[in-house]
UniProtKB/Swiss-Prot annotation:
InterPro entries with a match to the protein in the record: G8P, Phage_M13_G8P_capsid_dom_sf
Highest taxon above the source species: Viruses
Functional summary from the UniProt entry: Self assembles to form a helical capsid wrapping up the viral genomic DNA. The capsid displays a filamentous structure with a length of 760-1950 nm and a width of 6-8 nm. The virion assembly and budding take place at the host inner membrane.
Keywords: Capsid protein, Helical capsid protein, Host membrane, Membrane, Signal, Transmembrane, Transmembrane helix, Virion
Cellular location(s): Virion; Host membrane
Family: Belongs to the inovirus capsid protein family.
Zinc as UniProt keyword: no
TM annotation in the entry: 59-76
The protein's name: Capsid protein G8P
One cellular component term from this protein's GO annotations in UniProt: helical viral capsid
Subunit and partners: Homomultimerizes. There are several thousands of this protein in the phage capsid.
Signal peptide (from-to): 1-29
Gene that produces this protein: VIII
Stretches of the chain forming a coiled coil according to its record: none
Length: 84
């Protein structure tokens, strides 16, 4: 195969790929949003958001406790070193 033939073949592949991409984008845009796959994806994202919110709510007391404990340790070290 010559270089020109390879370049022409590559151009044809690019044109076909671009056409398929445009066709699939058009089909996706034409979707009315009531398809089963879309509703499953929406349910999954809503479930994930709910779980993330629950985990964040459970994490705040732990973070607060660690921060207060760290502050208490620093203050204890500071005042105990001055007392000696």
């Amino acid at each position: 195969m010559s270089v020109i033939t390879k370049v022409a073949a590559a151009k044809n592949k690019i044109v076909v790929g671009a056409g398929l991409l445009m066709a699939s984008a058009g089909a996706f845009a034409a979707d009315d949003g009531t398809s089963t796959a879309t509703s499953y994806a929406t349910e999954a994202m809503n479930s994930l958001k709910t779980q993330a919110t629950d985990l964040i709510d459970q994490t705040w007391p732990v973070v607060t406790s660690v921060a207060v404990a760290g502050l208490a340790i620093r203050l204890f070290k500071k005042f105990s070193s001055k007392a000696v």
